[in-house]
């Protein structure tokens, strides 16, 4: 029974985007393990509070991730 746990910084993805993540990861697992495992393929999306995620020794905020996605340097 596949269990996929995705951690994201809160406020970066919309509810629709999170649903798409769940659908796409389920499809990826089914493609690998077979259709019979679809009913028992679990995908959990956990959101981590802004600033509670560290990269290179520094906290990363929702604003930082959105800036990165827009192509701006963070630092």
Where are these regions (language model features)?
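A domain-level signal for the structural core that forms small-molecule/cofactor-binding pockets
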Residues: 2-75
């Amino acid at each position: 029974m596949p269990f996929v746990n995705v951690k994201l910084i809160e406020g970066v993805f919309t509810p629709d985007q999170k649903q798409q993540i769940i659908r796409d990861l389920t499809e990826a697992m089914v493609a690998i393990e077979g259709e019979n495992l679809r009913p028992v393929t679990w995908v959990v999306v956990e959101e981590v509070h802004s600033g509670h995620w560290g990269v290179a020794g520094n906290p990363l905020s929702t604003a930082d991730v959105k800036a990165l996605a827009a192509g701006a340097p963070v630092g």
